[in-house]
């Protein structure tokens, strides 16, 4: 009975930590989407600085990273080979989260940065570049976690 309760507790903690990461990713994407559109329409124009946006992004990134690293180091994946459909959905969501990160990276570094003018605020650009790198890493970590879950859920399936 104690073992059953421990496994149930591990499942709840695992799902809670994964949910924190997924909700954080949705928040990042929803927050950055208007900027993404602005960069696509007006490459080279520096976006206006809003202190609250940077703070909210950093809080979301730190929260996602705390959940990821705690889960990775302390909470094993409690699901094994139970559903090929859930396995595929998890793998798909993992890839989908990183597609957005890849699209944002490509837009910023291959379209926006080459068009920047000499009057660009380099300190602001560096700060935003650091936040972008942190955001891409958080999305990458979420991708890894979803792929680990998908692999575990599909471990008993024939290829």
Segments from the language model and where they lie:
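Hydrophobic alpha-helical transmembrane segments of multi-pass integral membrane proteins
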Residues: 21-28, 58-68, 97-108, 138
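Transmembrane alpha-helix entry/boundary detector in multi-pass membrane proteins
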Residues: 13-17, 39-64, 87-91, 124-132
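Membrane-interfacial segments
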Residues: 36-40, 76-80, 110-118, 150-157
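Hydrophobic alpha-helical transmembrane segments and immediately flanking/interface helices
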Residues: 44, 114-142
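Cytosolic juxtamembrane helix at the C-terminal end of the final transmembrane segment
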Residues: 70-79, 135-159
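Cytosolic juxtamembrane helix and N-cap/initiation of the first transmembrane helix
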Residues: 1-27
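Alpha-helical transmembrane segments and their membrane-interface junctions
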Residues: 27-37, 99-123
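Loop-to-transmembrane helix junctions at the membrane interface
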Residues: 71-99
